[in-house]
């Protein structure tokens, strides 16, 4: 998915605000869902959708107003009800990695508001996407935990 940093996305530090990275990645997820057949039509007809239940974002380099970006998606894992994806945001002209996002989504029956299995047609599309990425490997940025290496204070500390 391609986009451009809108001027209203710029914060007091004169770079793209964190909230808009999430927005851009969310739009990237929508593009990925379309490849699987999870469209507005699917949501309306099936009364099913996806809910994000966990995410982790890393910021690598700043983006400024009007700069173009490219978001790519990689499937990390899936099962009959869940999908774990990883996205990268690159500067579309200079090629540098600006940010990454890792998300876990659930397939949900909207009427029951409960997790539900993927329909076979969607699961088949997810499987085909995964097969095309078998050689991609696990991204270095995926599965990270927030950490202060040598904290002065830590709530985890048992001194």
PLM feature spans:
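A broad, structural micro-motif
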Residues: 16, 50-52, 98
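Short helix-to-loop capping/linker segments positioned immediately adjacent to catalytic or ligand/cofactor-binding
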Residues: 9-13, 59-61
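A conserved, well-ordered hydrophobic junction motif at loop->secondary-structure transitions
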Residues: 12-23
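HotDog/MaoC-like acyl-thioester-processing domains
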Residues: 1, 59, 63-68, 76-159
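Short amphipathic
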Residues: 1-7
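GIY-YIG nuclease signature motif recognition
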Residues: 25, 73, 113
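Hydrophobic beta-strand-centered segment that forms part of the acyl-chain substrate-binding groove
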Residues: 32-77, 81-83
